[in-house]
Amino acid sequence: MELMITLSLAAVILGIGVPAFRDFGRDGRLTGAANEMLVTLITARNEAVRRQARTSFCSSSTPDSSLAVCDASATQGYIAFVDTNGNCQREASEELVQSMVSHTEIYQRDNMDCIGYLPNGFRVVIDGQPANAHAVFCDKRGIAKVKDGTSHSYARGVEIVSTGRAAVTRLYDDINLWAGGGTPVTCP
């Protein structure tokens, strides 16, 4: 009898705990991916100010290589480099400041093919582009609101404003707008 009660209690605890633990792991992966991007962006900006030179941040299909170059469609990682000629393409002679291998795919990038930083730390805004750039990280849960009474999304978003400041957010309204403003989203 005692064994039956113990097994029943264990089944209830596992039934409640395992799904919550799975979401905890997923949340950690998304937060980690967004923070990886944020660290590389902050490094690019800080190096521009420290060196008084233009730097750039971009996606790369070979971020773990000393010959890493920019690739707008890449999801393997990011690089930050001293962009001496200001063309947002890393040349062999341009110093690699930081590289980061990403372990999570980005669902959506908006205006993030290349983020350039000026020596004053401000972002280079190319004519015709919006002042802010965004990236959305999500998993199979999509960008839906977390059902906990907050305005948080399951997804994570990174925003870079024209002043060069980058930040991570979980706010559903922002992420929904960046991911297509109500258009159905298919996440990896």
Mark where each language-model region is.
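Residue-level micro-sites within transmembrane alpha helices that shape
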Residues: 1, 7, 44-46
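Alpha-helical hydrophobic helix detector
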Residues: 3-20
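N-terminal helix-rich module
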Residues: 16-42, 46, 50, 54, ...
